[in-house]
């Protein structure tokens, strides 16, 4: 039990690192929550700080999810505080990742007002189901390029994830997932691309959560007032 608490607590603190707010303070001396959409995530960083800072914030937010779902769980598997929790591996990684997402959205370091959790949730899922997430990322990037609406891309990507898991698992009959091996710098690395049913259930919950956290964006889209991103506008 102590190990599970430690995993969730540290994952929350990692997710709570307010990357967007820190970038705004360092680059322009501002709180980006007071500008643009009023959000502390990567999307608003693109609008307020420019594409370079926005990309950096987004990548760091993604990294928080990967660290929680992969590195923190792996660390405590080898260094448990008491007994390691008897929980399905994918379910445990999802719990750790969700703790990081909660930290990102309700960050203790910035008055519990953070981002919307899309990038951190994406990072968590990259760590668990990288191949499925590559497809989702492709959908996200294509939608951003065509529409210039990051909010639309986030919503479509969230809806696509559980569908992709279901299609790969049941239509292509890939079972619980596949193991892949890559060679980098002369070393052989392996990783597992999970298709565990927990991912489908979780994906549906995330899709609903993304729709909820983007309700203001949806209202602006319907009224035609949603902000579009413009690449190259800022340096």
From Swiss-Prot:
Major localization class: membrane
GO CC terms of this entry: plasma membrane
Topology with respect to the bilayer: Multi-pass membrane protein
Catalysed transformations (reactions): an acyl phosphate + sn-glycerol 3-phosphate = a 1-acyl-sn-glycero-3-phosphate + phosphate
Compartments in which it is found: Cell inner membrane
Known EC number: 2.3.1.275
Gene Ontology BP terms: phospholipid biosynthetic process
Gene Ontology molecular function: any one: acyl-phosphate glycerol-3-phosphate acyltransferase activity
Quaternary structure and interacting proteins, as annotated: Probably interacts with PlsX.
Biological role: Catalyzes the transfer of an acyl group from acyl-phosphate (acyl-PO(4)) to glycerol-3-phosphate (G3P) to form lysophosphatidic acid (LPA). This enzyme utilizes acyl-phosphate as fatty acyl donor, but not acyl-CoA or acyl-ACP.
Protein's UniProt name: Glycerol-3-phosphate acyltransferase
Source species: Chlorobium phaeobacteroides (strain DSM 266 / SMG 266 / 2430)
């Amino acid at each position: 039990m102590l190990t599970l608490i430690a995993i969730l607590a540290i994952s929350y603190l990692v997710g709570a690192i307010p990357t967007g707010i820190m970038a705004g303070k360092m680059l322009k001396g501002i709180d980006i929550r007071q500008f643009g959409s009023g959000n502390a995530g990567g999307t608003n960083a693109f609008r307020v700080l420019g594409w370079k800072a926005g990309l950096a914030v987004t990548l760091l937010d993604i990294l928080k999810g990967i660290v929680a779902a992969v590195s923190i769980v792996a660390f405590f598997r080898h260094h448990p505080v008491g007994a390691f929790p008897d929980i399905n591996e994918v379910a445990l990684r999802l719990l750790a990742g969700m703790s990081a997402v909660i930290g990102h959205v309700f960050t203790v370091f910035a008055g519990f007002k953070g981002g919307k959790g899309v990038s951190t949730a994406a990072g968590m899922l990259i760590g668990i189901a990288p191949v499925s997430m590559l497809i989702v990322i492709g959908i996200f990037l294509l939608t951003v390029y065509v529409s210039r609406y990051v909010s639309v891309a986030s919503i479509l990507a969230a809806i696509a994830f559980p569908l992709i898991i279901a299609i790969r698992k049941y239509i292509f009959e890939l079972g619980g997932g596949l193991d892949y091996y890559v060679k980098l710098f002369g070393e052989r690395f392996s990783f597992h691309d999970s298709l565990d049913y927990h991912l489908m259930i979780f994906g549906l919950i995330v899709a609903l959560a993304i729709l909820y956290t983007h309700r203001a964006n949806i209202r602006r889209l319907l009224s035609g007032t949603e902000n579009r991103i413009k690449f190259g506008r800022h340096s």
